Structure formats: C-alpha cells, structure tokens
Regions:
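Conserved, structured core segments of small domains
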Residues: 1-92
C-alpha cells in the first residue's frame, strides 16, 4: 500500500488552533488506531505539521483529510499531499 507525506500550513490564529486541537487530535487517534495514520506532529518554530499516511490512493488521503476537524474549522491554509517512497526504516 502506498505511503503519503502530508504537510499542513496553518493560517489560523494560535487561539483558534488551540480551541480545535483536542478534537483534531481525537480524530487523528482514530486514524492511528485504524492503521491509516502512521505518524504526525508539528514542525518546530513554524506553523506547519507533517503527517504520514498509508492509503490506496492520493485521492483517498485527500478525502480522509477533508474530514479533519482542523480542515473543517478553516485552520489549514495549504495542504500538500505527496506519495512518499520510504527506502529505510519501519515503513519501507
């Protein structure tokens, strides 16, 4: 199954992000439990985050991410989805 790297670029205020973050993290925990989300977390000192997904297609990742509470709440200004080919490590 292909692996995808997703970058979120946030445009929401820190206060709005903090308000939505608990339901966003609960949603991510559900994706982790089902095995589609492999890892996620914020980048340091920049309003971006990286998420690693397993899915059958880029379209499937995009459709899943459309249901992310951060996306629904308008926190994400840009979302970049790229197929990733991990050569080394636990996901290769």
């Amino acid at each position: 199954m292909p692996t995808y790297a997703v970058t979120y670029h946030y445009t929401a205020t820190p206060e709005h992000l903090a308000e939505v973050r608990p339901i966003h993290r609960a949603w991510l925990a559900e994706r982790l439990a089902e095995g589609t989300l492999l890892a996620s977390g914020p980048m340091v000192d920049t309003p971006t985050s990286l998420l690693i997904w397993r899915a059958d297609s880029l379209k499937q990742v995009a459709e899943t991410l459309d249901n992310d509470p951060f996306d629904i709440a308008g926190c994400i200004g840009e979302r970049v989805i790229q197929e990733w080919n991990p050569i080394f490590g636990p996901w290769s």
